[in-house]
Amino acid sequence: MLSPEVRALVKATAPVLKEHGEALTRHFYTRMLGGNPELRQLFNQGHQQSGQQQQALAAAVAAYAEHIDDPSVLLPVVERIAHKHVSLGVRAEHYAIVGKHLLASIREVLGEAATDELIDAWAAAYGQLADLLIGRERALYAAAASRDGGWTGWRAFKVVRKTPESAEITSFYLAPADGGATPDYLPGQYVSVRVYVPELGLMQPRQYSLSEAPGMPGQLRISVKREAGSPAGMVSGTLHNRINEGDVLDVSPPQGDFTLDAEDGRPVVLLSGGVGLTPMVSMLNHLTARDDGRQIRFVHACREAGVHAMKEHINALAAKRPNVRKAVFYERVGADDRRGVDYDYEGRVDLHAIRDEVILPDADYYLCGPLPFMQAQRRALADLGVAEHRIHAEVFGTGGVA
C-alpha cells in the first residue's frame, strides 16, 4: 500500500505527464531499446515508428498518476495489458528493465523538477503496478499451460491451408508442428504470430483474432488483412507474400479479454468494420454451432465488394437460421452488386436507420474495428439508449474501415 505522501507526489505529476508524456515515453523507448536491443523483438516496430506506442504509454502513465488514489478504476486496462503481455511472452524479469529506464527517463526529461523524493515516489508506484501485472500474468501463464493442448511462450505451427477471403484478407489454418493438440479458447480471443521480417532484421509479433469457433480439431484459424505501408504492413505482407502452405510460424497460446458471454442467453448484436469481423465470425460460428436460439444480429461495414470477406458464409448462416439476421453496409456500391445478397445498405453504418433491427431488449453489443468506427458506433448506441455495460469493444488498428 502506498503512503498518502507517495500518492500525493505521484498524483501531482499527472498534469505534467499529460502535457509532456509523449516526450517522456519517446525518450524512454529510445533509452530502453538502445540499452536492450533484444527487446525490439517484443515491440511492434510499426507502432514504434508511427508514435502509436509512445502515445499509448504516455496516456497509460498519466492515467495511473491521475487515479493513484483508486487504481481499481484501471483494472479493466490492467487486465487487457496482462493478456497482451502473456501473448507476447513478457516475463517478470522484464519489469525491472522497464522500471530502471522509466525512472531514469523521468529524471532526465523533467530535469530539476524530478527531485529524489519524486523519483522515490514513482519507484514505489511503479513497483505496485508491476506487482499487480506480474501476479495477473503469472495466473494467465499457468492457465494457458494447464489446458489440454496448452503451452506457454512460442510454439511452432505449420500452415496447413491458406485461403483468400477477399482482395485484402487471407485465412491461415494452423496445426501444431509437433502433431499435438490445440487448446480450447473463448470466442473473441487472439493469438500472437511471430515471423522474421528481413527488412527489419528482426522477429516481429502481431496479434490476430482466432476467426473460427473453438473446437476445430487440431487447428487454429487466423484471418489476416494485408496492411499498407512500411513497417506497419511488414508482418501482414510477409504472411501474405512469403508464407505458404507447409511453412512454419511461431504462435502464442490464445489470450484476450474481449470474449463472448455465451451462457447468459441474452440477444447478441455483432458490429464490425473491415477486418474487425474476424472475432465476430468466431462468436457467430460458436453460437450457431450450438444451435443457440437467441436473437443474433450481424452488422458489418466495408468499403466495397472486393474487400468483403466471408460473405457467402454469413449469407448461408442467415438464410438457414431465422434467429440470425445480417445488415451489411458498402461505402461504394458497384454496378454488379446485388442488394440483399452482396450488401444490404449503401453508405456507412447508420444504427439509427436500422434501429428496429438491432436495438433489442437486454442485448449485448460486441464491437470491433478501426478506432473511428468504434467511436461512431459507441456514440450511436448511447444515443439509442444502450447501457454502457452492455457494450463490449475491441479496437483493430488506427485507420479507416477496410
From Swiss-Prot:
The record marks Y29 as: Involved in heme-bound ligand stabilization and O-O bond activation. Heme b binds at H85. Keywords: Detoxification, FAD, Flavoprotein, Heme, Iron, Metal-binding, NAD, NADP, Oxidoreductase, Oxygen transport, Transport. CDD domains: flavohem_like_fad_nad_binding (cd06184). It catalyses: 2 nitric oxide + NADPH + 2 O2 = 2 nitrate + NADP(+) + H(+); 2 nitric oxide + NADH + 2 O2 = 2 nitrate + NAD(+) + H(+). Transmembrane segments: none annotated. It holds the Pfam family FAD_binding_6. The active site is at Y95, E137. The record marks K84, E394 as: Influences the redox potential of the prosthetic heme and FAD groups. It is an enzyme of class 1 (oxidoreductase). Residues 152-261 form the FAD-binding FR-type domain. One of its GO terms (molecular function) is oxygen binding. NADP(+) binds at G274, V275, G276, L277, T278, P279. Residues 149-402 are annotated as: Reductase. Its cofactor is heme b; FAD. Its EC number is 1.14.12.17. Is involved in NO detoxification in an aerobic process, termed nitric oxide dioxygenase (NOD) reaction that utilizes O(2) and NAD(P)H to convert NO to nitrate, which protects the bacterium from various noxious nitrogen compounds. Therefore, plays a central role in the inducible response to nitrosative stress. Consists of two distinct domains; an N-terminal heme-containing oxygen-binding domain and a C-terminal reductase domain with binding sites for FAD and NAD(P)H. Belongs to the globin family. Two-domain flavohemoproteins subfamily. In the C-terminal section; belongs to the flavoprotein pyridine nucleotide cytochrome reductase family. This is Flavohemoprotein. It comes from Bordetella parapertussis (strain 12822 / ATCC BAA-587 / NCTC 13253).
